[in-house]
UniProtKB/Swiss-Prot annotation:
Belongs to the UPF0319 family. PANTHER family: UPF0319 PROTEIN YCCT. It holds the Pfam family DUF2057. This is UPF0319 protein VFMJ11_1730. The keyword Signal applies. Keywords: Signal. Coiled coil: none annotated.
Length: 209
């Protein structure tokens, strides 16, 4: 009887959490999601997939991210990293994803920092309104305290600022398949691009180590 009661209580709790997680944000592999609603996001890796999803409550949210498209030039892989973008949006009961321009070279991708021509769209390709700003830092980029910078930004009256009292992340962990660092992102990217024979050789090489 006691076990049944515990099970019932757990089921009710999970149902309650699930009922409030009404926004699903899909994160592509070229997006480095840094903060959500002033919180660091822990990424869970799964090697063979390249998409991530984040469940959020209905309401207003702030995302902080970099856009890192990857280009192949000869034998080299070139990553073009944008400045950090701070964006605030509101939504209810939506499946939301990022939409970026298509660039065919690293040189053209550098225009993204100037144009900031990305979108948030729902599953019907409708745009989700948002405010945005770049988090510009003129000093050494290594060792930046981005969370502190964003907290300072959020004290301003900028439309993209995130104020206390807004709803927060329902699940701090993202169901992620892109990895936490550039090296792992590269592995995911080129594994997906490889033919079946190359994939099999790669898998054999890591299982034999």
């Amino acid at each position: 009887m006691k076990i049944q009661s515990i099970f019932a209580a757990s089921f009710c709790l999970l149902s309650s959490i699930s009922a409030h997680a009404a926004i699903q944000l899909t994160v592509p592999d070229e997006v480095e999601l840094i903060l959500v609603d002033n919180q660091e996001v822990k990424l869970e890796s799964s090697f063979f997939s390249t998409t991530s999803t984040l469940d959020l409550e209905n309401g207003k949210h702030q995302i902080v991210f970099r856009y890192n498209p990857v280009f192949k030039q000869g034998k080299d892989n070139i990553i073009v990293s944008s400045d950090i973008i701070v964006s605030t949006f509101s939504a209810e009961d939506k499946e939301i994803s990022f939409k970026f321009p298509t660039y065919n070279s690293p040189e053209k991708a550098k225009a993204f920092n100037r144009d900031l021509n990305w979108e948030l769209i729902d599953k019907n390709n409708n745009s989700i309104p948002f405010a945005q700003s770049q988090l510009i830092y003129n000093g050494m980029q290594v060792g930046r305290n981005i969370q502190f910078e964003v907290a300072k930004f959020n004290t301003t009256e900028h439309p993209a600022a995130f104020k206390e009292g807004m709803l927060t992340v329902t699940h701090k962990e993202i169901k992620n398949e892109q990895g936490e660092n550039t090296a792992e992102q590269m592995l995911h990217y080129w594994y997906e691009k490889a033919d079946q024979a190359t994939k099999e050789r790669f898998l054999k090489s890591i299982t034999n180590k």
